[in-house]
From Swiss-Prot:
Record's GO cellular component terms: ribonucleoprotein complex; ribosome
Source organism of the structure: Trichormus variabilis (strain ATCC 29413 / PCC 7937)
Chain's role: One of the primary rRNA binding proteins, it binds directly to 16S rRNA central domain where it helps coordinate assembly of the platform of the 30S subunit.
Quaternary state and interactors: Part of the 30S ribosomal subunit. Contacts proteins S5 and S12.
GO BP terms: translation
Keywords: Ribonucleoprotein, Ribosomal protein, RNA-binding, rRNA-binding
Name this polypeptide is given: Small ribosomal subunit protein uS8
Matches recorded under PROSITE patterns: RIBOSOMAL_S8
Annotated SUPFAM superfamilies: Ribosomal protein S8
Amino acid sequence: MAANDTIADMLTRIRNANMARHQTTLVPATKMTRSIAKVLQEEGFIAEISEEGDEVKRNLVIALKYKGKNRQPLITALKRVSKPGLRVYSNRKELPRVLGGIGIAIISTSSGIMTDREARRQNLGGEVLCYVW
């Protein structure tokens, strides 16, 4: 099944795998999904990323992280902000803070995909892709 919004598809797959307490989940590999997964890994929300599949159909294998002996997911929520039908942009002065700094906003800037903190540090604005906390 082809997804028009690959970012929303990725977030939904991660959310569903978290609720079902799966170790890993498969996400279609695109430049955008690779970049978002890399940011999530750098921020400590997911354990590791690897790729599988042939040249035509590559998938990212995302290993999820859990905490405690009840295996509570580290990712409490994933929320898509900018959608294909309604793009949301933010300048450097108005970058959102997610839950007062506890969560992160993933921003697409002219220097690549990064967190809201990194965009603030580099004095950049851009498209607000999603919130993670």
